[in-house]
Amino acid sequence: MEGVTVKRLCTYGQFEYEKTMKALNYPSEICFDTNQFTSHESLSKFYIQNLDYLDFGDGFLVTLDDLLLINCKHIGVTFSRLREKHLNIYLKSWLRGQKEELEHVCLLASRINWEEVVPYNKEVLLKGLKYTTVSDDVERLFYCSVPDTDGKRVVAIKGGYDIRRKDGRLFTIVLQNDFPRFEMFVWSNDQ
């Protein structure tokens, strides 16, 4: 497939990851619905690539160690099993200066069953972090360098919790509890 550039690869079902990536000249935006990797070593190598967009479907289990390894601007995980303590560790890692390219993380928490919703506990999630609560009636526009699967580049954020890193970088945590959702927005210096 010489001369063809594929920017975003979305997979559905099984396919030969290594051959496909090589043939498509390693797209920078990838959506997986299932885990295509045969070993943790190959998965770890994949995580440390410089990607723009990475979205994991419900057939993909992402651990805290995985999240800490992923080098990407946008990370999306459907049916995440990561809970408050894991995310607290991740946030503290970012505050120490890791993941400079990160712009957005969106995790949809898995439910125990479809009737029982387990919302994120803000106190556990933000434990030990200095944050400012932003009122739910305050709406801000977040500009993404990479469009989502619908092609949108602008996200309206209502409320949240602002946290500032020592170097001045600001990020906002937004928790939605009707379908437990954790989002982290890292503001660029010109927003």
Regions found by a protein language model. Give the residues of each.
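Non-core capping and flanking segments associated with repeat-based/extracellular domains
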Residues: 1-191
